[in-house]
Amino acid sequence: VCPTDAIAPHDLTWPRVVRRAFSDPVVPHEATGVHGRGTEEVKTNDVTGRVGEEEAGFTIEFGRPGVGVRFRDIQKMTMGLASLPIAFEKKNPVFALMSDPVTGTIRQDILDEKVLSAIVELKTRLEHVPTVLARVEEVAPQLDTIVSIGVATRCDSQGGNQLEPLLKREGYVFYRGKTNLGLGRRPAVATA
C-alpha cells in the first residue's frame, strides 16, 4: 500500500478479515479471485455470458467510502429479494457469505461487520424487472446506508433491447453507462 513500507497492514482474524476483502481494492476476494469489489459484474458480459437476451442482470451496491455498510443491512435486502423469481450470482463475494441463498440469509458471525461497499448481483427475466425494482425501493429506506442500482441486458443482433422501454414505462430515468461491443473473448484453453 505504501511505497516505502511506512504503513503496513495488520493481520486480521475472522470475522474482521472480511472487512479487508470488501474495503481494500488491492486485496483479491478469496471466493472469486477478483480484486476491488470482488466481481466483474456485467461489465464483462461479452466474455462471461452471464446475462442473455430476455434477461436482466442487476447490481445492487451498498455503501460507499465515508458511509459503509454492515452485512446486517445487506441481509435485509437479500432476504427481501430471495422470494422473488431471481437467481443470485454465484460468482459474487456476497453470495459466498450467504448461509442460505434460498432465503437470502448471510452468515450470522459477520452480520455486524462493516465494509466500505459491497455488491449483490442477481439475474431475472425481463418481465420481472418491475417487481425487483419495487422490492429494492421498498427495502432501501429501511437500511442504514445508501443503495445504488444498475440493471443490464444483452442487446439483440440489431443493437436493440426490451429493457429501455420497460424502464421508461416504469418511470425510471437512466443512462446507458456501458455498451459491450462483443470484442472480448474467453481466454484460450491450453491443450497438451
Task: Please report, for each region that a protein language model flagged, where it lies by residue.
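Short, surface-exposed ligand-recognition loops at beta-strand->loop->(often short) alpha-helix junctions
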Residues: 64-72
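Short glycine-/aliphatic-rich beta-strand segments at the starts of folded cytosolic domains
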Residues: 55-64, 118
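Long, contiguous binding/interaction regions
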Residues: 17-55, 73, 78-83, 98, ...
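Short, well-ordered beta-strand segments in beta-rich or mixed alpha/beta enzyme
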Residues: 115-122
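Histidine- and/or cysteine-centered catalytic micro-motif in compact active-site loops
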Residues: 63-65, 93-94
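Flexible, glycine/charged-enriched surface loops at secondary-structure junctions
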Residues: 8-12, 85-95, 145-152
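Iron-sulfur cluster-binding cysteine motifs and their immediate structural context
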Residues: 1-15
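Helix N-cap motif at beta-to-alpha junctions
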Residues: 122-129
